[in-house]
């Protein structure tokens, strides 16, 4: 990874559910470590649980809610 690429750290506060055609993606609510008042919903591929720290390459995009 390039040192010039800005990244944002976020902590998983709640696992919302599984999504994707085969359930391979997990939808989670995360709060940013720099600004704990700001939370967004993201899709995560792979194993994830509450209190995990995610490295977000792009922090403005929010996932659509599960139906």
From Swiss-Prot:
Q: Name one Pfam family in it.
A: Ribosomal_S28e
**InterPro entries linked:** NA-bd_OB-fold, Ribosomal_eS28, Ribosomal_eS28_CS
**This protein's UniProt keywords:** Ribonucleoprotein, Ribosomal protein
GO MF: structural constituent of ribosome
- What Gene3D superfamilies would the database entry show? Nucleic acid-binding proteins
Cross-referenced CDD domains: S1_S28E
State the protein's name: Small ribosomal subunit protein eS28
Naturally occurring in which organism (per UniProt):
Candida glabrata (strain ATCC 2001 / BCRC 20586 / JCM 3761 / NBRC 0622 / NRRL Y-65 / CBS 138)
Q: What is the lineage of its organism?
A: Eukaryota, Fungi, Dikarya, Ascomycota, Saccharomycotina
Gene coding for it: RPS28A
């Amino acid at each position: 990874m390039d040192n010039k690429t800005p990244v944002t750290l976020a902590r998983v506060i709640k696992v919302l559910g599984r999504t994707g055609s085969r359930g391979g993606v997990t939808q989670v609510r995360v709060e940013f470590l720099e600004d704990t008042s700001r939370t967004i919903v993201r899709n995560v591929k792979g194993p994830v649980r509450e209190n995990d720290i995610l490295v977000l390459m792009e922090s403005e995009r929010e996932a659509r809610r599960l139906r």
